[in-house]
């Protein structure tokens, strides 16, 4: 099986070659049963900032806790599109390794992890095993005569990070509402239900987003869609005239501050 993988190595944190794949049972959501995976073939795979971070962790020898059980490597590329031979269909893959928590919802049996791909291989191999419940159906109309356009795959590869940002916006809504509704009850002399709604909306009156990568642009767009009056500021290193900055500002109705300093002293 040909693949691209991360390993703990100062000289070669990212390597290519043959690898053995493992059918490790996984669950879709906490509380559900674990299921063995089914084979799917990689079609289009994304390489994101998380992959870059994992590669650097391997260079520093800190990747062991990310390896799947019984392995000394992690296949990278944790979002993309695959072909499922047994079901004769294309699918979007979601990768989930372990249980995460956020401060408002975690329970005592959950453990924190930085990346959803903890101990779960990605798609940068010819094929691999995936939980069948994590092979999401592609909407009708995109696949024609058994083929899917490359242009569509390029968009679908962003499904997973976009979903992550929907989740993060919801968490910000939860936290803002819970933190401030009593203040709003006193301020506006209103009911608890009305105060919670006010607190949720006012959480996004002023928003500062650090970083203008994929997730930064996505969360800005999602906040603007839900709260069009939000004053959004992006802070990033890109030139003000770059196409990425222009696109993000137009999409989110935002303003921009460039922070291109090499040291904290220069930034201050």
Each language-model region and where it sits:
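NAD(P)H dinucleotide-binding glycine-rich loop of Rossmann-like/cofactor-binding domains
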Residues: 78, 93-206
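Glycine-rich beta-strand-centered segment in the early N-terminal region that forms part
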Residues: 27-46, 59-105, 122, 141-142
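Conserved small/polar residues in nucleotide/adenosyl-binding loops
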Residues: 1-5
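Cytochrome P450 core scaffold surrounding the K-helix E-X-X-R motif
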Residues: 50-56
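Glycine-rich Rossmann-fold phosphate-binding loop(s) that bind the pyrophosphate
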Residues: 161, 211-214
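Residues forming the Rossmann-fold NAD(P)(H) cofactor-binding site
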Residues: 217
